[in-house]
């Protein structure tokens, strides 16, 4: 019995009331309730009921009707079979999944509806076709196994052929940050509650329990992976980790309807080797969003899709492994010599996405044009290897050795595939002449048919004496002899009528019929032969799978590093140094995005943070003075250093930083009912609870959104906490009272940004100077913003009155409530606080009361 979950409530559950075709549809749909079913009918994929309504809305196609259900029309929508790919791509990019249901039976022999089966399931993270993918971004499937308030997470970049296991996560916030950093196209989980809440705002589905069975997981690991890899995985990881890995393999098997043999590697991401940045900080620092001002858009100028995706992985997981960073820096320096990277980048620009092409070969979705692109790309490898060998360093040689020069495969593809093949093998015309003798002979029968028909037509004209006689062909009736009806008396007896038209008759002869059978038979045989050759060719190509994947990974690596070398020269970047002295010394630091987008010269600044001198900078100065830019550029520089890039500074000596936290800007989170201040406090609490002496913390204007005294009190308390933790902290504020902290804490210093006034105008110097700011210049900034003159004059008068009043009351009111020195507690209060009323005896209480009375007297 089918539920009403997947079709209109108006439809009766008893499908026997439907036509045989709709009955067939509903039976198939019952197995794919949560995804759209593309049901093949002739030259169209049709959708029915709620699927039709959803597709019509998503694709902007016409919603029609077919037949009745319970007295109401059945909604129907469809897309042409030959154009389906474009429509499917739209659906997948919106985060939905599709089941493709094809006609698998023979219409000529079928009794009732032609047999149909789902031949393929397409989900957002398991597509491999170029039309469905972003060339510059990995297509990622995440699996989350929740157990005992812990989250086990694994993910796969589907076309990369690898599964990555992440450390066990112990909080929802930690899980959310990890998932959003990966930016997956699809999430699967065993937790229905997590799927229902969906804190990630990504396509997510809760799977049946068996997907997360440890027994099933081990079975799929053994079935899917190479024996040695499987044994290693089973011995290396714990049961819950294996369950998570197995859930991905079982899900892929179900989607592919085959074992995912293209998965060849499982690896564990070591957190201690990673610079951690939560999702809010990534957004605040504009690291890798899609805007033109993002750091990625400025740094990322790779020549291949392979390199662009690898660079995004670097952005997702900056490494703290100094050996890896030293290797990258060494290669950047080598490629930068005499701008050798230019020659390499020129070759790289001719290399296609061979990683995804070979994955499509493995998955059975490859197209003939992909094979041509693979051949053309592999032809560039000898040139690339020669260029790399000219830089004979151990680091470059190591990469070069992993680029395989596949001459035999290039020769095979060159001989087999024509230069501009059709989109699919379906209609043939892919295999080059001369590659297969039998195919050539079958094709020659069709190719030589024109000569036969010319001779046959001339012979029939002579035989009948009818000069207007024509020999032709159409796809419905085949070959024919056409004569006008006025020549009916001259028709030879061996002519058999095939078709009657208004002014003519069409005939067939035994000789022409035999020729037709031979030609059509040869065409069918040629197509079958060509498909066999093509399948055999793909089996040969797949033998090179591991070599091509390794080559692709090496090309991606050299592309990223050549890009870094080019960016280093173009953007005047320098190689950073790393120290173990808990010191961060940066000279002439620049903000790349701002520098890129302004016409005037960018003013660089120095930054020094050290455990021995200062870990906390209190930064004051006017709005628009440069405080936020100063802080952001330091964080971006650290980030660039840990992805292996050179950095925008004349000098950079960097200590070990394990996490970057930022609290920059805020807005109301209306959907969650949280105010600006609540958002700010939540983010601040997260930083305070997690920051360590190895953290870099950026705090911009904390304490806004509440009263002045509340804001000042909170800002002071937070600053003191960061000073106590010893985290490297850049703390921008308009509360000038906080500058007094430098007198209390030896690791706190003041930095301010100056501005100059001239004839009622303000000029920002954008230069960081030691010491506290003396003025905020708020009214001058308001003038720059376009506030009218009458309002400005009123503001000046208000400011004068407030400052005058402040001078009179400052020593008694503000200092009494918010003095920076800790208030000395009243001795009487100290005695009262020391009493434990739960443990003292009545006699002791009387004695204490007597002593207190004496104190008061």
Swiss-Prot record:
GO CC terms of this entry: cytosol
Keyword Nucleotide-binding among UniProt keywords: yes
UniProt GO molecular function: ATP binding; ATP-dependent DNA damage sensor activity; damaged DNA binding; mismatched DNA binding
InterPro entries to which the protein is assigned, alphabetical: DNA_mismatch_repair_MutS, DNA_mismatch_repair_MutS-lik_N, DNA_mismatch_repair_MutS/MSH, DNA_mismatch_repair_MutS_C, DNA_mismatch_repair_MutS_clamp, DNA_mismatch_repair_MutS_core, DNA_mismatch_repair_MutS_N, DNA_mismatch_repair_MutS_sf
Gene3D superfamilies per record: 1.10.1420.10, DNA repair protein MutS, domain I (3.40.1170.10), MutS, connector domain (3.30.420.110), P-loop containing nucleotide triphosphate hydrolases (3.40.50.300)
Superkingdom: Bacteria
Pfam families in alphabetical order: MutS_I (PF01624), MutS_II (PF05188), MutS_III (PF05192), MutS_IV (PF05190), MutS_V (PF00488)
Binding residues annotated for ATP, in chain numbering: 621-628
Listed GO biological process terms: mismatch repair
Transmembrane helix is among the record's keywords: no
Keywords: ATP-binding, DNA damage, DNA repair, DNA-binding, Nucleotide-binding
UniProt xrefs under NCBIfam families: mutS1 (TIGR01070), PRK05399.1 (NF003810)
Family, per entry: Belongs to the DNA mismatch repair MutS family.
Function text: This protein is involved in the repair of mismatches in DNA. It is possible that it carries out the mismatch recognition step. This protein has a weak ATPase activity.
Listed name of the protein: DNA mismatch repair protein MutS
């Amino acid at each position: 019995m089918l539920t009403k979950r997947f079709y209109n409530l108006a439809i009766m559950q008893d499908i026997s009331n439907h036509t045989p075709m709709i009955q067939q549809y509903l039976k198939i749909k019952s197995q794919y309730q949560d995804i759209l079913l593309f049901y093949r009918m002739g030259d169209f994929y049709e959708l029915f009921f709620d699927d039709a309504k959803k597709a019509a809305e998503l694709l902007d196609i016409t919603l029609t009707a077919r037949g009745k259900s319970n007295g109401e029309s059945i909604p129907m929508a469809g897309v042409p079979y030959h154009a389906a790919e474009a429509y499917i791509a739209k659906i997948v990019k919106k985060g939905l999944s599709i089941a493709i249901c094809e006609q698998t039976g023979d219409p000529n022999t079928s009794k009732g509806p032609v047999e149909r089966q789902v031949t393929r399931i397409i989900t957002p993270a398991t597509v491999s076709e170029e039309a469905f993918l972003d060339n510059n971004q990995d297509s990622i499937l995440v699996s989350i196994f929740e157990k005992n308030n812990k989250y086990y997470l694994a993910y796969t970049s589907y076309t990369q052929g690898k599964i990555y296991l992440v450390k066990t996560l112990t909080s929802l916030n930690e899980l959310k940050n990890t998932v959003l950093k990966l930016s997956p196209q699809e999430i699967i989980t065993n937790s229905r509650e997590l799927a229902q809440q969906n804190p990630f705002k990504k396509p997510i589905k809760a799977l049946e329990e068996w997907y997360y069975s440890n027994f099933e997981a081990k079975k799929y690991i053994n079935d899917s992976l190479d024996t040695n890899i499987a044994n290693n995985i089973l011995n290396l990881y714990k049961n819950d980790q294996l369950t998570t890995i197995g859930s991905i393999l079982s899900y892929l098997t179900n989607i592919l309807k085959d074992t995912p043999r293209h998965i060849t590697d499982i690896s564990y991401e070591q957190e201690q080797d990673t610079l951690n940045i939560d999702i809010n900080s990534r957004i605040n620092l504009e690291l890798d969003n899609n805007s033109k001002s993002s750091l990625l858009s400025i740094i990322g100028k790779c020549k291949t899709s392979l390199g662009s995706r690898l660079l995004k992985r670097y952005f997702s997981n900056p490494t703290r492994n100094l050996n890896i960073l030293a290797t990258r820096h060494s290669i950047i320096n080598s490629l930068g010599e005499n701008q050798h990277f230019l020659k390499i980048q020129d070759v790289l620009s001719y290399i296609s996405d061979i990683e995804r092409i070979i994955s499509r070969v493995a998955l059975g979705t490859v197209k003939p044009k992909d094979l041509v692109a693979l051949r053309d790309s592999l032809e560039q490898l000898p040139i690339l290897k020669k260029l790399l060998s000219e830089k004979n360093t151990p680091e470059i040689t190591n990469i070069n050795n992993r680029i395989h020069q596949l001459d035999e495969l290039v020769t095979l593809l060159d001989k087999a595939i024509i230069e501009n093949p059709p989109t699919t093998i379906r209609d043939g015309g892919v295999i080059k002449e001369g590659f297969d003798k039998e195919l050539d002979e079958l094709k020659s029968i069709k190719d030589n048919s024109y000569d036969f028909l010319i001779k046959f037509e001339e012979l029939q004209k002579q035989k009948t004496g009818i000069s207007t006689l024509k020999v032709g062909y159409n796809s419905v009736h085949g070959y024919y002899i056409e004569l006008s009806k006025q020549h009916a008396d001259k028709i030879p007896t061996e002519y058999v009528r095939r078709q009657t038209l208004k002014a003519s008759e069409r005939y067939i002869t035994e000789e022409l019929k035999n020729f037709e059978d031979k030609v059509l038979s040869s065409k069918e045989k040629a197509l079958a032969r060509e498909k066999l050759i093509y399948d055999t060719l793909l089996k040969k190509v797949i033998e090179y799978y591991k070599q091509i994947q390794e080559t692709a990974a090496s090309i991606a690596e050299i592309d990223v590093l050549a890009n870094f070398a080019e960016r280093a020269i173009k953007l005047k970047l320098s190689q950073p140094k790393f120290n173990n002295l808990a010191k961060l010394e940066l000279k002439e630091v620049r903000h790349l995005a701002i520098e890129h987008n302004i016409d005037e010269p960018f003013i660089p600044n120095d930054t020094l943070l050290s455990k021995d001198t200062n870990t906390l900078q209190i930064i004051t100065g006017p709005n628009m003075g440069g405080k936020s830019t100063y802080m952001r550029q330091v964080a971006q520089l650290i980030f660039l250093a840990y992805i292996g890039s050179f950095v925008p500074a004349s000098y950079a000596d960097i200590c070990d930083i394990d996490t970057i936290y930022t609290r920059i800007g805020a807005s109301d989170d209306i959907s969650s009912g949280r105010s600006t201040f609540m958002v700010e406090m939540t983010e601040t609490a997260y930083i305070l609870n997690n920051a360590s002496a190895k953290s870099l913390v950026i705090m911009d204007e904390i304490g806004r959104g509440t009263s002045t005294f509340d804001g000042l009190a909170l800002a002071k308390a937070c600053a003191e906490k960061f000073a106590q933790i010893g985290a490297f902290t850049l703390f921008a504020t308009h509360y000038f009272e906080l500058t007094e902290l430098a007198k209390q804490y030896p690791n706190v210093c003041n930095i301010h940004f100056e501005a100059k006034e001239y004839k009622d105008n303000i000029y920002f110097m954008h230069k960081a100077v030691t010491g506290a700011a003396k003025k905020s210049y708020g009214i001058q900034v308001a003038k720059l913003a376009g506030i009218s003159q009458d309002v400005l004059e009123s503001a000046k008068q208000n400011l004068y009155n407030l400052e005058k009043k402040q001078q009179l009351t400052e020593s008694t009111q503000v200092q009494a409530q918010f003095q920076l020195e800790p208030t000395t507690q009243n001795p009487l209060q100290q005695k009262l606080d020391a009493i434990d009323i739960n443990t003292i005896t009545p006699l002791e209480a009387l004695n204490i009361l007597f002593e207190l009375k004496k104190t008061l007297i």
